Amino acid sequence: TLIRGETGWIIVDCLICIETAQAALNLANENLGEKPVSAVLITHTHADHFGGSRGVLTDELLAKGDIPIIVPEGFTKYAVNEAVLAGNQMARRAMYQFGLIVPPGPSGYLDAGIGKGNARGNRSFVLPTV
């Protein structure tokens, strides 16, 4: 979600991968007017909410340290614990849940029913500032 703030885009959840987050930001800038990212709000610890953070937060922005990255209390602990402690099981389940092990065929590909599947790109994680 993009919110047009007074000083730039406030991004609520950064999608699941870098490539889709960057494409979404580019689409908004091209069609709604160019704005810098002024804040990022991540609502919870699932990767589809923070995985694209490096697609909207460049090294230069992060080095400056003036972009608030707002998360719930305990976010880093829970995100790391979820990835480390349950990551293998979640990844294995996702292969079946989202049809990742079924190759696309002549009629398309298997999807998750409520969505057309997960983006297949690079994920990222940035430390919160707030």
Regions inferred by a protein language model and the residue ranges of each:
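Metal-dependent catalytic neighborhoods of phosphoester/phosphodiester hydrolases
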Residues: 50-64
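Solvent-exposed loop/turn segments at secondary-structure junctions
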Residues: 16-18, 45-48, 75-77
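Conserved beta-strand hairpin/beta-sheet module of binuclear metal-dependent hydrolase folds
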Residues: 1-35
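A short helix->loop->beta-strand "cap" motif at the edges of active sites that frequently abuts
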Residues: 35-37, 60-67
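Metallo-beta-lactamase
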Residues: 37-50, 77-130
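Short, solvent-exposed loop/turn and secondary-structure capping segments
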Residues: 22-23, 52-53, 79-84
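Short internal beta-strands
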Residues: 38-41, 68-75
